[in-house]
Amino acid sequence: MTTTVLPELGFYTLPGQPDSSRDLIDEVRLGEQLGFGRVFVSERYNKKEAATLCGAVGAVTDHIAISTAATNHNTRHPIVTAGFARTMQSLTGGRFTLGLGRGIAPMQDAFGIGRITTAQMEDFADLMRRLFRGEVIIGHDGPAGSWPVLHLDATLDEYLPMGMVAFGPNTLELAGRCFDEVVLHTFFTDETTVRCVETVKAAAERAGRDPDSVKVWSCYATIGDHIAEEERLMKLVGRLGTYLQGYGHLLARTNGWDETVVDRFLADEVVSSVRGLDVVGTTEQLEHVATLIPDEWLAPAAVGSPAQCVAAVRNQLDLGCDGVIMHGATPAELAPIIAEYRATA
């Protein structure tokens, strides 16, 4: 029996830090069997290099759509990125979307990678579009960089779907102008989510585009009670704690949260001694961290029974999102929630 595809639902493969990159194979096969419409591939500089993971996803699936969410345009030469995207389109029969993001500024500073600007991403997106139309680009000198020649194939005339992981208003407006899908950040409040959707759609309309053609994905932590308590602690408290460590003030400003809470959080001895709470934090450490995070900050998530999770996911669609990424859990962990979603359609 063929499973009906749920195009409005997606998941991240290899959430958090996997024991092995090969875990992806069973995850995406099951995700496709369950009927997820799209799998999202994140990137970390260890066992989660995006091009490798995307190739593996494409090789072991038949119809699920695949998006990077996200890679950074300045960690590869533009021709390497364009070649990666074209190879993925060929491998998958056109199921691939190249998703970009700004990255994490402290990490970029530490590694000597330049910080990414809105102008750079807009310039880079235009370069990718031109390369996929078969253009020979001579002497480009723009915000994304300078190159003598950029060229893929003179016979190429394709449209490359592109996505954006967006946070602030400038990036959201850019996504509406130039991109095909937008992934919002985890732990956005309902008010923030509505504002982001409206910003994207309005920017698309001002650019003369059909607002419905730009798909906005809520990235929504979906952690059911059927998952062990220690794992739930890692996937919720550990994940939000890691975000607060990386860019807590930005997240607080975006949601209208009290930034002094972030200051106290970052000054805590346990928090300052553990980098990557969602990877290496112990249960004892995470229980302590939970006392530092207001309950309302953890509230924008799907938790509880499968029915409660489904209700929370559907609320994201009611807020105006075109799709929901059930974030932080594997397809196996999400299976009871998908079953409830189908049963109550």
Which residue stretches match the model-derived regions?
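Alpha-helix-loop-beta-strand connector modules within alpha/beta enzyme cores
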Residues: 50-71, 75, 124, 131, ...
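N-terminal beta1-alpha1-beta2 module of alpha/beta enzyme domains
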Residues: 1-68, 160
